[in-house]
């Protein structure tokens, strides 16, 4: 009887130990499998871009970095797989939205220059943000950010300015596949001053002095729907019916 009790205790201890081991293995896997979200750690420097958006829209940010330096060990390659030149460009897509509700957005963007593990200087070149919904899956209200210059077209915009993609409305056009497709165009404003003559279906560019970026920098950008803003996509029947009628 005593032997059976000892065996039962040992079996129970083994089960408990196994459960604890599996718990920590699972926790470790969970931690390592989580996406690397920039800006969720206190030692990560970033600028913020935030504002309003249509509740059905989702946004994404693209950042592009120069990779340079005399000691840089990374190379760009040509179509034949041969080394073309030292350094190159890194592109990063950011999709994590820190906003707490669907009518706003908040993205955190790395901006500081640093030296990577290949002794290359990595420096922010430009970045952009654009919206998508089920009607316009290609993207709309795209805003690009580039370094300011001395020409009339790339003059510096104040970092505290409010940028607005206003009166964003849907339009239908014939695609290269001879089907009708949807797109959304917007009018762009900076501090209430209209910057685009017609609806912009491509992108608008803002020029900043990147050297002024710091951890407190917040870019204010609102995307506002117009009366003819559309969320629902064209159905297959609608596309073919319209094309048939046009022919």
UniProtKB/Swiss-Prot annotation:
Q: How does it sit in the membrane?
A: Single-pass membrane protein
Keywords (alphabetical) are: Membrane, Transmembrane, Transmembrane helix
Mind telling me which residue stretches traverse the membrane in this protein?
7-27
Q: Where in the cell is it found?
A: Membrane
Deleted gene: phenotype: Deletion mutant is susceptible to killing by V52 strain in a TseL-dependent manner.
Q: Which GO CC annotations does the UniProt entry carry?
A: membrane
UniProt function note = Immunity protein that plays a role in preventing early activation of toxin TseL.
Q: What is this protein called?
A: Immunity protein TsiV1
């Amino acid at each position: 009887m005593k032997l059976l009790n000892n065996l039962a205790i040992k079996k129970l201890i083994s089960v408990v130990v196994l459960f604890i081991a599996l718990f920590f293995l699972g926790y470790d896997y969970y931690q390592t499998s989580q996406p690397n979200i920039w800006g969720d750690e206190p030692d990560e420097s970033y600028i913020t871009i935030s504002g309003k958006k249509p509740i059905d829209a989702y946004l994404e940010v693209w950042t592009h970095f120069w990779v340079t330096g005399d000691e840089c060990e990374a190379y760009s390659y040509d179509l034949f797989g041969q080394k073309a030149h030292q350094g190159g460009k890194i592109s990063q897509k950011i999709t994590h939205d820190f906003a707490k509700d669907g009518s706003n957005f908040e993205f955190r963007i790395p901006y500081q220059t640093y030296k990577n593990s290949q002794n290359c200087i990595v420096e922010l070149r430009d970045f952009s943000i654009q919206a998508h919904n089920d009607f316009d899956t290609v993207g709309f209200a795209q805003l690009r950010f580039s370094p300011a210059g001395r020409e009339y077209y790339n003059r510096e915009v104040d970092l505290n300015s409010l940028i607005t993609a206003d009166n964003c409305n849907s339009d239908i056009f014939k695609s290269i596949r001879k089907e009708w497709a949807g797109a959304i165009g917007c009018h762009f404003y900076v501090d209430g001053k209209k910057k685009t003559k017609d609806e912009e279906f491509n992108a608008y560019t803002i020029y900043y002095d990147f050297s002024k970026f710091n951890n407190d920098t917040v870019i204010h950008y609102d995307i506002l729907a117009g009366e003819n803003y559309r969320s629902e996509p064209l159905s297959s029947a609608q596309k073919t019916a319209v094309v048939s009628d046009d022919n």
